[in-house]
């Protein structure tokens, strides 16, 4: 059996849609700002989803059943769920010197792309290198030191 409309919408909003347009929180906020300017009335991210769903309803009303339209409607509803139910990632903090970094911050990245991590057994930070980041040996110990979120 092929996937249902709801399963397809879920796959798209967490996969291809997310890859192409980013998290709906930012994308719908951008659309809301544009709609607000055009309409000269403040529009929210939920309004964006509702308006897009209404557009799909208008198409279906005029042309009849098209699976894609109903998948899109489910996708817009799923995007609203993601906006309001998924945790917001904070902005990474940064410090000028390694000594300024609070003890509760596990890992920071230096200007030279060295990753400095605090280990519970040591009273200092140790640095390492990660794939995908070109290490600049001259700046390993230079700021700014940017917090690595999620660690």
UniProtKB/Swiss-Prot annotation:
The protein, known as: Gene 55 protein
InterPro entries documented for this protein: DUF6378 (IPR045958)
One Pfam short name: DUF6378
